[in-house]
Amino acid sequence: VAAPVSPVVDARPSAPAPVPQPITVSRFAAGQALNVRRHLDALRDFRRDEFGDSIARPTAGHIHAVNSLLGQLRTPLDRAVHVLEQAAGSPSTDAMASRAETLLTAKSRAHDWVRATEKVWDFYFELFGQRQSAFGVWLVSCDRIALDCYQHVFMHLGQPRSIPSPPPFAYMRTGFSPATYRRGIPLRKLGRQSNPFPLVQLPYHRLVNPWTMGAILHEVSHNLQNELDLQSEVPAAIVHRLGSAGAPREAQLIWARWNREIFGDMLGLLLGGEAFVASLLDVIGRAPEQVLDYSPRGVHPTPYLRAKLSFHLLSSMGFDDVAQHYAAVWHRLYPNTSTHTMPAQLFDTAERAIPLVVEAVVGTKFVGLGRKSLREVIFFEPRHQVMIEEAAQRLASGIDPGVIPERFLIGAVRVAVDRGLAEPETLMRNFYLELSRR
């Protein structure tokens, strides 16, 4: 039997246990100053190359605009950090309570600015980060449609205006309707800081079905109304036109309250043509109780009337047969209007008011347009629809559609899917392929 092995005993003296260092105000202060200084340093400017090298990455203009906003926020943050560092480095005195209060106040202010700045930094980090995802090409395609709309409008104004920069930026948000956030408005998601460029929010279900993307034209039109200083001129024109025709005062004010959504539809139709109407009906064609329901504080026209505005404008653009067809379908879908909840002064005068409202929006010569009317700045004629239909055939065949404007590709893919020229998946792929290579 083997002898038991004796354990090896380490004859070296054991190391003394670490002695906890007492927490002092000075150590606490130094730690807080270090933390917020590192927070400040981490909230640095963005670089364009950190979002990849594809065509989908943010433009230099978008990066610069966000960095300028971050720079504005870092100035008070830097001051707050400096105050905290001074408080942390001040010598101990007998008035410890006073020193602690000064320190804690400085710490709280610095952290408030850290949170405010980081909220903005995080928002744009996630926004720009979408461009590195599988949806990057889709989003930059939407950017190019929006840019085409802006360029076309600003090229045809009656007088020169300062060029807006940077252009709109599209991003995806699932589970929501299309929306937009205008340049220069305070945003809650930015801590009430001003938005440096227009944002166009698009849901996934629209992006995957680009023939429903008339929403881009509508949302971009909201931005253009403000970029062109028409936010007051348009409702005033509506009230004036209706008042001159003897419309009831209540009806005048309701139509004026709806001016932004009406303008978005009218300009969207002038930009995109008849496919815009089809896309609009996709959205507002719902159950009768929804289509006929009036919202006393709503900014959207009651859907039943909203569709008729577009039918009237489409007819005046030279598409009378198409407009009559849409109107006939609309009336077959909603033959009974007896359950509507609209005020009598609005509903009973609507048929007379609709042409007046449309003319007020597209026919008034606005100062913001260089004393031109909207239909003089933007127009869509039957010849443009011929271009769209030719482009639809090319998209379906995977052929380069040529020099057609980006915004017309929405109509082209709509025609192609409605006529079954190719499988929807093929049309979606070709739509984004064409826009992404421009």
Residue ranges: model-predicted function:
Residues W211-Q231, D265:
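Active-site recognition of the HExxH zinc-binding catalytic motif
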Residues V19, I23, A245-S316, D320:
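Metalloprotease/metallohydrolase-associated module, dominated by Zn2+-dependent proteases
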Residues P160-P164, S232-L242, V277-R286:
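Short, glycine/acidic-rich hinge or "gate" loops at secondary-structure transitions
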Residues V200-I216, W255:
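Short pre-active-site segment immediately N-terminal to the catalytic Zn-binding motif
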